[in-house]
């Protein structure tokens, strides 16, 4: 009898310790979520303070992965490895909202893209489009098409890339998502430039610049300025090129902003 009681007490203590640890992790993730929009670098440091995220339960680990992806969208650090995002998707596919399922699939596709597994990334993006389309998640449809465009760009299939960027731009425009609309236009212009259609590229980028003037996101405006500067340089219009490239250097980071703005 005493032995049974001792086992029960030990079990309660162990469970209590686990619950306490989980509660601390939940509170920390709440703080990370609040900090992302205000100070994403601080949010990243907070998230990294969880030393062994793989020991979290599936629900909390999935949330940890989602927040890591959102931080990546802000500070352009490396996306999580596929095995972690696969585990996160396993949980969201059963328990998450359609929005969460599509978002985690986008991160998973980007991770496979980073690994160079383009076929797997395309399969995942196709799944994301199916869920987003059924639930009329227009912004997420736009993001997914943008990343599909990146896949085609990586394969030097520029016409196919442009088609996807154009579809993305239409969805962003429809949703009044100014930042992502400007980024999609930037990418259309970039592809035309790669195809030596410099005048058309410039036309698209001037539109992107006028769209970006409506945003307070300096990373977006810097990326448009950088693209314009490069186009003018390719046209040997060096005064204009210098003007836009200097504007980009003075305001932006070293990496271009992502579509999820």
Regions found by a protein language model. Give the residues of each.
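A "functional boundary" signal
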Residues: 18-261
């Amino acid at each position: 009898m005493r032995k049974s009681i001792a086992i029960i007490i030990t079990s309660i203590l162990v469970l209590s310790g686990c619950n306490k640890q989980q509660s601390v992790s939940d509170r920390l993730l709440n703080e990370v979520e609040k900090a992302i929009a205000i100070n994403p670098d601080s949010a990243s440091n907070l998230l990294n303070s969880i030393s062994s995220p793989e020991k979290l339960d599936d629900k909390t680990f999935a949330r940890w992965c989602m927040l890591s992806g959102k931080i990546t969208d802000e500070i352009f650090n490396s996306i999580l490895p596929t095995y972690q995002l696969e585990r996160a998707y396993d949980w969201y596919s059963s328990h998450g909202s359609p929005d969460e399922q599509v978002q985690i699939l986008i991160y998973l596709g980007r991770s496979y893209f980073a690994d160079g597994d383009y076929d797997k990334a395309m399969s995942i993006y196709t799944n994301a489009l199916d869920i987003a389309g059924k639930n009329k998640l227009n912004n997420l449809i736009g993001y997914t098409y943008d990343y599909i465009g990146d896949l085609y760009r990586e394969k030097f299939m520029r016409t196919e890339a442009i088609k996807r960027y154009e579809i993305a731009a239409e969805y962003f425009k429809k949703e009044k998502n100014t930042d992502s609309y400007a980024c999609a236009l930037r990418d259309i212009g970039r592809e035309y430039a790669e195809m030596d259609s410099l005048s058309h590229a410039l036309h698209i980028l001037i539109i992107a610049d006028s769209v970006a003037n409506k945003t307070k996101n300096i990373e977006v405006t810097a990326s448009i300025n950088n693209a314009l500067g490069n186009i003018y340089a390719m046209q040997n219009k060096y005064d204009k090129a210098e003007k836009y490239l200097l504007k980009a250097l003075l305001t932006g980071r070293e990496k271009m902003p992502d579509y999820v703005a």
